[in-house]
């Protein structure tokens, strides 16, 4: 008799995705982040669901309802901080996952890569709207500043902003719709993640060497299930250390002050995971130019497969490209730091140089380095 997991219509899908899936024998821990992102999404959805049971999306009571969750609801403080810091862990895993894809040439799986880029946009939109919900000072002013950027779009800009706001400023209507969108988007993210996996399993995983691994495959279970469990335990350890020892480490103190439209905070800045894009936005004096640069800083990921000029897939055997890749990582860390600094000398010029370097590396230097490496190989 055939095993039920291989015949049952539903079990068969799970079996072919997580149990009998043929996987390369040499994939490193950099391949753990896909499963970690899945765990992050589950944690965020569950904690978010429980928070939504006690949250009220009204400007008069939103801030109080979050306070009520932390003070009066059983383990409400734990759920709230798991959700807030879970978002940070989500983005750490996202950045490492994308970085892995860049380094090892995984972007040559076009459908998987482009759905991944779409997923990144969707998660960023979800996180932005979630940050508005506690209705603190940074929530309100962050929402005002970021939504206002759409007014830079020629002709329809101001109408578009008022349409999103549901009025002439960020107010009750804005908060209510942001809560609705913040609730529905994670389910869209989950569906997209399913499609992401579907396309990945059409080709099979890439591996560190970038070479075909068809001749050397091993079953996903037990090898990679055990390996993924180790990653999950490490993720939960870091998350719990954050939540239980320093839950406000990555937050902004201004968000413990209720939103006040009459009082602007001295430094308006988003959560740490948006700071690199915020720095790029601020480094261009023109409003429309800044918005375009902001969108392009993420959208550039979609162009990376077109810029692949190397004869090798992975960077494993390409020292020059490796060097440029790590310069790009350092540049992104610099941009993240600059995004959190006030707009004054010397931060302005550092931000502008780092922004120019970011686009130059991706669009010009890395493709040129690949061409140069091709010539070194005498192919």
Swiss-Prot record:
| Cofactor: how bound | Binds 2 heme b groups non-covalently.
Keywords of the record = Electron transport, Heme, Iron, Membrane, Metal-binding, Mitochondrion, Mitochondrion inner membrane, Respiratory chain, Transmembrane, Transmembrane helix, Transport, Ubiquinone
Membrane-spanning regions, if any?
33-53, 77-98, 113-133, 178-198, 226-246, 288-308, 320-340, 347-367
What does the entry list as the binding residues for heme b b562? Answer: 83, 182
Classify the protein's membrane topology as the record does. Answer: Multi-pass membrane protein
Which top-level group of life is the source organism from? Eukaryota
Q: Which Gene3D superfamilies does the UniProt record give?
A: Cytochrome Bc1 Complex, Chain C (1.20.810.10)
Any single biological process term in GO: mitochondrial electron transport, ubiquinol to cytochrome c
Q: SUPFAM superfamilies under this entry?
A: a domain/subunit of cytochrome bc1 complex (Ubiquinol-cytochrome c reductase), Transmembrane di-heme cytochromes
Q: Which InterPro entries match?
A: Cyt_b/b6_C, Cyt_b/b6_C_sf, Cyt_b/b6_N, Cytb/b6-like_sf, Cytochrome_b, Cytochrome_b_C_euk/bac, Cytochrome_b_N_euk/bac, Di-haem_cyt_TM
Name where it mostly resides.
mitochondrion
The cellular location(s) given in this protein's UniProt record come to: Mitochondrion inner membrane
| Binding positions for heme b b566 per the UniProt entry | 97, 196
What does UniProt give as GO cellular component? mitochondrial inner membrane; respiratory chain complex III
Which GO terms label this protein's molecular function in UniProt?
Answer: metal ion binding; ubiquinol-cytochrome-c reductase activity
Annotated residues that bind a ubiquinone are located at 201
Q: Which Pfam families match?
A: Cytochrom_B_C, Cytochrome_B
Name what cofactor the protein needs. heme b
Family assignment? Belongs to the cytochrome b family.
- What does it do? Component of the ubiquinol-cytochrome c reductase complex (complex III or cytochrome b-c1 complex) that is part of the mitochondrial respiratory chain. The b-c1 complex mediates electron transfer from ubiquinol to cytochrome c. Contributes to the generation of a proton gradient across the mitochondrial membrane that is then used for ATP synthesis.
Extra remark: Heme 1 (or BL or b562) is low-potential and absorbs at about 562 nm, and heme 2 (or BH or b566) is high-potential and absorbs at about 566 nm.
Subunit structure comment from the entry: The cytochrome bc1 complex contains 11 subunits: 3 respiratory subunits (MT-CYB, CYC1 and UQCRFS1), 2 core proteins (UQCRC1 and UQCRC2) and 6 low-molecular weight proteins (UQCRH/QCR6, UQCRB/QCR7, UQCRQ/QCR8, UQCR10/QCR9, UQCR11/QCR10 and a cleavage product of UQCRFS1). This cytochrome bc1 complex then forms a dimer.
Kindly provide the name given to this protein in its UniProt entry. Answer: Cytochrome b
The organism named in the record is Anourosorex squamipes
